[in-house]
């Protein structure tokens, strides 16, 4: 698959080199200095940390097919700021994070400004360092994505209402090269015996993903109101992870996750600097994976079996205000203040919460999180922007047992940033 992808990229480069007649480059660079504070891990707090995001792309048009555009894209994101990341519905703090993404594909304008087709192949490499002494590139949750997506774009009007619709399909092959289950370790196998637990595979997090999605962006005449609606359905089979049944027995059946997501955004733009936005998101996750908890003992009488352990229903609400403040930094120039609030509620269908000692409560697990942020942005020139940002996030859950993940803590960051775009 990698060789085929590389061959296609080289072939397209040769074609564009011979037939190119129009070249449109684009480049973005963002840099931030950040001070993080977390309520749970003093080791990951730093007096000053940084983040750099870069993105570069260009469009090449050919005289062979003037409506066909070749578009390679490269992005690189790095952060040394302590930050929470979700891993399989559990949250961990990471000290460093690096993400590299490459895509190459084409846009074909069947009817310019009305109908367009897009095809992309992509490759992503993600490195995440949990502790300071962990070697970068050897992280347990490092992963690589390879895949492609196809989109059909239509732009049309209905009365005074402008629409842009998209229908697409995305395929992703995700691999965790460093991940190993505990019982795959030879020392552990010798201790427990090879016949007492068949869970000796090492690639239990590797998966494939098939995603179909549709969206509609609507402009309501000259009112400056917009509506963005999107629905997606994702089918994710795991390549090796086996389904757990009663008594902890693993079968040959593989885990399959199914996600249904619906998002609605309603923005209003008063002018170039001011506006408001409302948003709602609904996520339904269904899985055939179960959970068998031995509660740290060898007595089977107190074991707990939970069917469909990862099923949940999630709701997200967003509210954002953009407000232009004239003459705040320089006379005759406007600074934009962005105040944002995000509230999230996750209700698990069958998973029970635990107390601090690890014993199950009679209540199902519920997570309630929120983030509030203030962002000041000022354009020095058309291509150069500076910013200052502060954000506070609070995670709260009735799951109090945190030996395998974080559920209750707060996270604060404050920082200064600068970005250039060409």
Residue ranges and their predicted role:
Residues 54-64, 98-110, 148-154, 212-218, ...:
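Residues on the lipid-exposed face of transmembrane beta-strands in outer-membrane beta-barrel proteins
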Residues 408-422:
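Outer-membrane beta-barrel "beta-signal"
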Residues 20-61, 77:
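Short glycine/proline- and aromatic-enriched beta-strand/turn motifs that initiate or cap beta-hairpins
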Residues 66-72, 110-118, 156-165, 220-229, ...:
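Repeated loop/turn-to-beta-strand initiation elements of outer-membrane beta-barrel proteins
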Residues 215-241, 257-353:
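Detector for outer-membrane/organellar transmembrane beta-barrel domains
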Residues 29-39, 76-84, 121-129, 144, ...:
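Transmembrane beta-strands of outer-membrane beta-barrel pores
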Residues 25-31, 72-76, 117-121, 165-169, ...:
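Membrane-embedded beta-strand positions of outer-membrane beta-barrel proteins
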């Amino acid at each position: 698959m990698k060789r085929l992808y590389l061959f296609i990229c080289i072939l397209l480069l040769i074609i564009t080199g011979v037939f190119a007649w129009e070249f449109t480059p684009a480049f973005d660079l963002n840099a931030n200095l950040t001070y993080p504070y977390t309520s749970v891990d003093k080791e990951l707090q730093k007096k000053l940390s940084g983040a750099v995001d870069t993105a570069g792309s260009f469009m090449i048009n050919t005289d062979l097919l003037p409506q066909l555009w070749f578009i390679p894209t490269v992005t690189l994101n790095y952060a040394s700021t302590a930050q929470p990341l979700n891993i399989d519905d559990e949250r961990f703090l990471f000290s460093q994070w690096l993400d590299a993404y490459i895509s190459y594909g084409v846009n074909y304008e069947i009817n310019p400004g009305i109908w367009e087709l897009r095809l992309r192949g992509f490759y992503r490499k993600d490195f995440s360092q949990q502790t300071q002494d962990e070697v970068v590139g050897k992280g347990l949750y490092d992963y690589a994505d390879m895949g492609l997506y196809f989109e059909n774009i239509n732009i049309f009007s209905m009365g005074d209402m402008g629409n842009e619709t998209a229908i697409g399909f995305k395929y992703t092959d995700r691999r965790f090269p460093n991940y190993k289950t505990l019982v795959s370790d030879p020392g552990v196998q010798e201790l427990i015996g090879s016949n007492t637990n068949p869970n000796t595979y090492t690639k239990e997090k590797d998966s494939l993903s098939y995603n179909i999605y549709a969206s509609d962006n609507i402009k309501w005449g000259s009112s400056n109101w917009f509506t963005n609606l999107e629905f997606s359905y994702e089918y994710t089979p795991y390549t090796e992870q086996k389904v757990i049944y009663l008594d902890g027995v693993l079968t040959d059946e593989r885990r399959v996750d199914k996600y249904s997501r619906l998002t609605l955004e309603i923005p209003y733009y008063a002018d170039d600097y001011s506006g408001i936005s409302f948003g709602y998101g609904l996520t339904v996750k269904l899985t055939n994976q179960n959970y068998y908890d031995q509660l740290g003992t060898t007595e089977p009488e107190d074991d707990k079996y939970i069917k469909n352990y990862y099923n949940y229903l999630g709701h997200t609400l967003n509210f954002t205000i953009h407000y232009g403040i004239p003459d705040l930094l320089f006379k005759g120039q406007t600074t934009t203040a962005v105040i944002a609030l995000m509230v999230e509620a996750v209700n698990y269908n069958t998973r029970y919460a635990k107390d601090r000692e690890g014993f199950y409560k009679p209540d199902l697990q519920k997570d309630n999180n929120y983030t509030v942020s203030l962002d000041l942005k000022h354009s020095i020139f058309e291509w150069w922007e500076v910013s200052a940002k502060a954000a506070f996030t609070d995670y709260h859950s009735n799951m109090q047992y945190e030996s395998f993940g974080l559920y209750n803590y707060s996270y604060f960051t404050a920082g200064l940033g600068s970005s250039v775009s060409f």
